[in-house]
């Protein structure tokens, strides 16, 4: 059977027979690595192109190194420990997560540098955070805080386990997500954290919700100024300053170029690893600054045509359960008339085969003049828009080489 990377769960659960596979997994009877993705395929499947993963990992780590940044890629994008291993081997500081549960997944798979990029109020979660250095004195696990209530909850948990909670004060902007809305509030939360015995490490924010890179750059500069005012409350020799969605991180780099020498900038971008054919393809900073590098889309979803009920319409057995749709519909990258590994793949002329609509389990294709003729049984290969809501549809994702042969299977932990 094909090796599943980063998965120590039982192969079967709940008494189901071994022939019932986890979503995305190859057929248990399929050959090990080396078979074509369509051999013994249970479509739809999601694949990751290994060469694109390697390329994107190297490009982003080189970018961070070139600009003197620490990189803590957001694990919530893929929740795949095997992909985290790649990022860490390339030089990432650790990982970012959105919740304590996600932090537990990272920790259980050996990653002990973790930033929980949210305020944590759950007592059990805070107690777990506070006890990490007892488990591993070299661990570095932090979370955000943006309220006195959050400070008090963390302090109670810290006392309950005789541990330590390390925090970053989160600063936001009006109409945005979490984070205090003023310098005065930031000072108050920072002072409360220190007075409560928490370990204040620095300041954090999220610029990804701002409308453009120029606005993001100006806002980050303002947050950096507040961080400088709070710096005397940070006892450590070096303070942390964390930012980083996947759309405006070039603005972050500009804004922190003249930062104090004792400040480490921790970038949290996550979507770069797999990139996409839609939302981030349009917004990536590498598109604005091609001299810094370029990313390649790694994700493809393979589905089979099940019906061609009328001229100009084809239905594929791929739907909202299989692809992201919150930031744009999938795009058709290729079709394979005949639908087997031996049939040649065809790239349709631009605009001739498009996704018009998604239902839970159906994709409506619109076909115009010049589109290749589709019949039931043909295979369509889709690119996606927004990787952060693509991975959660799958429990296993197949790694493929550039000739579409399977090289392994990666497990996700949502």
Task: Write out the residue ranges for each language-model feature.
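Active-site loop/helix belt of alpha/beta enzymes
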Residues: 166, 172-290
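A charged N-terminal "starter" segment
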Residues: 1-131, 410-414
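Conserved, mostly hydrophobic/aromatic
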Residues: 53, 76, 106, 169, ...
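Active-site loop ensemble at the mouth of alpha/beta enzyme cores that anchors a bound cofactor
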Residues: 249-340
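Flexible, glycine/charged-enriched surface loops at secondary-structure junctions
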Residues: 69-70, 232-240, 391-394
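Active-site-proximal beta-alpha core segment in soluble small-molecule metabolic enzymes
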Residues: 72-214
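C-terminal accessory subdomain/extension
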Residues: 311-414
């Amino acid at each position: 059977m094909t090796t599943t990377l980063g998965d120590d769960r039982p192969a079967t659960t709940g008494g189901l027979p071994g022939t019932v596979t986890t979503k995305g997994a190859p057929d248990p009877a399929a050959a090990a690595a080396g078979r074509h993705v369509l051999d013994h395929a249970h479509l739809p499947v999601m694949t990751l192109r290994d060469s694109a993963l390697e390329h994107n990992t190297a490009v982003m780590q080189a970018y961070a190194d070139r600009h003197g940044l620490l990189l803590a890629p957001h694990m919530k994008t893929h929740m795949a420990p095997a992909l985290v291993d790649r990022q860490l081997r390339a030089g990432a500081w650790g990982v970012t997560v959105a919740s304590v549960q996600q932090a537990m997944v990272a920790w259980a798979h050996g990653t002990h540098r973790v930033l929980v990029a949210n305020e944590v109020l759950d007592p059990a979660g805070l107690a777990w955070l506070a006890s990490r250095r007892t488990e591993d004195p070299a661990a570095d696990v932090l979370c955000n805080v943006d309220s006195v209530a959050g400070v008090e909850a963390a302090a109670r948990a810290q006392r309950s386990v005789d541990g330590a909670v390390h925090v970053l004060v989160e600063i936001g902007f009006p109409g945005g997500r979490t984070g205090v809305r003023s310098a005065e509030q930031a000072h108050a939360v920072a002072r409360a954290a220190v007075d409560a015995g928490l370990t204040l490490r620095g300041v954090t924010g999220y610029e990804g919700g701002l409308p453009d890179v120029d606005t993001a750059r100006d806002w980050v500069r303002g947050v950096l100024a507040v961080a400088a005012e709070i710096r005397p409350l940070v006892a450590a020799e070096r303070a942390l300053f964390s930012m980083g969605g996947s759309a405006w991180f070039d603005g972050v780099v500009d804004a922190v170029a003249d930062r104090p020498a004792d400040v480490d900038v921790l970038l949290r971008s996550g979507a770069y690893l797999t990139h996409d054919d839609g939302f981030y393809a349009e917004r990536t900073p590498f598109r604005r600054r091609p001299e810094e590098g370029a990313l390649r889309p790694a994700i493809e979803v393979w589905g089979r045509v099940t019906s061609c009920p009328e001229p100009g319409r084809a239905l594929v057995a791929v739907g909202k359960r299989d692809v992201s749709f919150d930031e744009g519909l999938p795009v058709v990258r290729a079709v394979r008339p005949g639908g087997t590994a031996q049939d040649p793949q065809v790239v349709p002329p631009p605009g001739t085969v498009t996704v018009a609509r998604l239902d839970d389990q159906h994709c409506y294709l619109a076909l115009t003049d010049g589109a290749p003729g589709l019949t039931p049984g043909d295979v369509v290969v889709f690119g996606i828009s927004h990787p952060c809501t693509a991975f959660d549809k799958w429990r296993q994702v197949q790694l493929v080489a550039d000739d579409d042969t399977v090289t392994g299977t990666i497990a996700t932990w949502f």
